[in-house]
Amino acid sequence: MFAGEGTPERINKRFHYLSADMPASRLSTAFDSVTLYGEDPDFRPDIFGKIGNSGVNICTLDDMKKLYAGFELTSPTTSVSMTINGPAPIILAMFMNTAIDQQVERYLKAEGEWEQTLQTVKAFFEQAGLQAPEYAGLLPEGNDGFGLGTLGVSGDTLVDPEVYERIKRE
């Protein structure tokens, strides 16, 4: 299931469509030339028209979280391949952080700390006078929003260092 054309939310919707009723999720991701060349998706004329063209544009960790929202990246039934060249180390780091932050979210929910964590994150953005990042549009069918709870924050700020290190190892 190869997908890539537009925003992370658009491709996430496509991934969920292609994976519906399948025993496993095979997510083959194509990136746009802006991402592949490591460019900032700026409003410069030579870049703006290429954003999301022939691939998904990923320039932040939040973009990666939105792209794979609703898929448990550490599950043996989820396989991800990415067509990347030059920015491979950066894209791989974003992917690994997305997978770890998903597991931080899972841990906080299992420990009954999720609602308090959401309030803490909300307060953080309010105090900073910033709008919290969000998934643009409605979640596609089959997407439970897993992985979106840490938009705008890193999992290492939400749990004790020992817990975070254990989650990273696992």
Task: Annotate each predicted stretch with a short phrase.
Residues 1-170:
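Catalytic alpha/beta active-site cores
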